[in-house]
UniProtKB/Swiss-Prot annotation:
Location(s) in or outside the cell: Virion
Keywords associated with the record: Capsid protein, Virion
Pfam families named in the record: TMV_coat
Name of the protein described by the UniProt record: Coat protein
Region described as Disordered: spans on this chain: 98-126
InterPro entries, sorted: TMV-like_coat (IPR001337), TMV-like_coat_sf (IPR036417)
Principal place of residence: virion
Lineage, opening ranks: Viruses
Methyltransferase recorded as keyword: no
GO CC annotation: viral capsid
Length: 174
């Protein structure tokens, strides 16, 4: 039973989209500086969010171990915790604020839970309010350290063991 649970958790972590905490926080703060009542600023926000690049790694490339001013870099799993719903809300809100597109960059259809009345369907300021709220919640979660992982924590969760053989570099996944 314990192995099955570990295997499910490791599979989810391996398939997840990981972002550097600092990249995500910098992007959120750049967006919050803009005037989101202006459509051009919402388009700029959408472009900033779409330009976020996930951490690239694989079986032969170790998860990056970056140092920041305060210590080791922390990473965010965009598929779990508070970040999954918040990122979806941010993507959907930017889509709803700029146009009624059918799908955004993450493949999320912009469905925003609002009261079913004509004002909510026609008023982009409501989705901009949701965008501001989601940005504030995301910034708060990142600053408070909610669901953040270091490289070591991620590798432990995946069960990866790295060995440096006596004759040179390399790795062994366990």
């Amino acid at each position: 039973m314990a192995y099955r649970q570990w295997n499910e958790e490791a599979s989810k972590a391996a398939c997840a989209t990981w972002y550097k905490r600092t990249d995500l926080l910098d992007t959120i703060r750049k967006i919050k500086k803009g005037d989101l009542s202006i459509t051009a600023q919402v388009v700029a926000a959408k472009n900033l969010i779409s330009s976020l690049t996930p951490v690239e790694w694989g079986h032969a490339t170790r998860f990056p171990d970056t140092m920041v001013r305060t210590g080791p870099e922390h990473y965010v799993n965009a598929n779990e915790g508070p970040y999954s719903d918040l990122l979806d809300t941010i993507y959907a809100s930017t889509d709803k604020s700029t146009c009624d597109s059918s799908t955004n960059a993450r493949g999320v259809t912009p469905t925003i839970s609002m009261p079913n009345n004509s004002r909510s369907r026609d008023d982009p300021s409501l989705s901009r309010h949701q965008l501001r709220t989601a940005l504030s919640q995301m910034e708060k979660a990142l600053v408070n350290g909610e669901s953040l992982y270091t490289r070591t924590t991620i590798e432990n969760k995946l069960g990866i063991v790295w060995h440096a053989p006596a004759g040179g570099g390399g790795n062994q996944n366990g």
